[in-house]
């Protein structure tokens, strides 16, 4: 059993100092931008129906963190072009998000990381990139990427001039990998992201890095991005104010 831990902690504090990354590393700046997407009529109808259902759920019982996050993610899924029905099936909705992503890529010079959360989106993104830029232009890094291919894909992205894009999930690629050849990071949707920003912004990066959020207008997307950027706990924030201000 360890003893006197409080005393040890106080002693260590007198000889230690907390230093932030930006204070000790000479890294180029981060730039942030948003690309706005207009919901299709089908999306807007589905979003409004889900919004009404979410309000009914949250007004009808004690609000919990899990309840809030579930409703927010259901709304966000619709802005991404799909949602999970009550029977568990995934329903696809016509949407403009992939079109806007391809517009961003067309305007992007150099290499780009594209983070997405849903497997169907990753597949769709890769198919669209291959169609425009060719099969050697993109690699993946997510849960279904075989372990033996993951490091090879990183090396290809870092060293092969023809490989301009890497598509992955922040759950798999947001920690512990280096992707400093990228000077653009695009968030296709709005899941956990703060650690994933630094896959491109770390030692070895010599260019400024631009972070692009794809945001559906007049939806929960805008609030989610602001909360993530400000490092706000989304569930506690929503519990502390009117939900209608978020959705």
What residues fall within each predicted segment?
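Short glycine-/polar-rich loops that comprise or flank the Walker A/P-loop
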Residues: 30-32, 134-137, 180-184, 205-212
